[in-house]
Regions:
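Extracytoplasmic ligand-binding site segments that recognize negatively charged/polar headgroups
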Residues: 1-88
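Mature extracytoplasmic/periplasmic domains
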Residues: 119, 123, 128-174
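Short secondary-structure boundary segments
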Residues: 7, 32, 96-97, 156-157
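Periplasmic-binding protein-like
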Residues: 62-67, 73, 106-129, 165-167, ...
Length: 175
């Protein structure tokens, strides 16, 4: 998870707590409703971790968003490419790889991952035991977790699950 922001319109945050400051009034949004959207729920979970809470008890994240709302800093607008581009959502809590994509439309868009709120989520991969071609499914899995497959995730802006091992092995593609 990350904090994406338009550096031409708001100061660079150095911590999640910065979003409670007056200069962020009416500018902070989530990518959806946390009761319905995984990215938004993970924004609340990130706030929980940043505020000394946990993933098992996200009440500190809920409290953080109550503070954001009562200060007038949180806006109940679902962040999207369009709202970032038109300036409605100048600060967005979202997956870093999704937020990084906003740079295409807003060159001053920056992405920040707070040190005290590092939170990741990975896609689950499975092979159905009833698959018509289980060997092909296994080969696909093998490819996804190969250096080549992981570098494709990286090219798409995601952080591959094997990135640390690939960095040590020198197999991460150079940008």
């Amino acid at each position: 998870m990350s904090i994406g922001y338009d550096s031409a319109k708001v100061p660079a945050p150095t911590a999640l707590a910065d979003l409670l400051k007056a200069e962020y009034k009416g500018k902070v949004a989530l990518n959806g409703d946390p009761t319905r959207a995984n990215a938004a729920l993970n924004g609340v979970m990130m706030a929980s971790v940043a505020n000394g809470g946990s993933l098992d008890d996200i009440s500190k994240g809920v409290d953080f968003f109550k503070q954001l709302k009562s200060s007038g800093n949180f806006i109940p607008v679902q962040a999207s490419t369009a709202t970032i581009k038109n300036g409605t959502t100048q600060v967005v809590l979202d997956w870093d790889y999704l937020s990084a994509g906003a740079v295409k439309n807003v060159p001053t868009w920056k992405v920040f991952v707070p040190d005290n709120a590092v939170l990741g989520g990975y896609y689950a991969q499975a092979i159905n035991k009833e698959a018509p071609h289980p060997a092909a499914a296994r080969l696909w899995q093998e490819y996804l977790y190969s250096d080549a497959g992981q570098n494709l995730w990286l090219k798409g802006g995601a952080r591959p699950v094997r990135m640390d091992a690939m960095t040590k092995a020198g197999t991460v593609d150079k940008a």
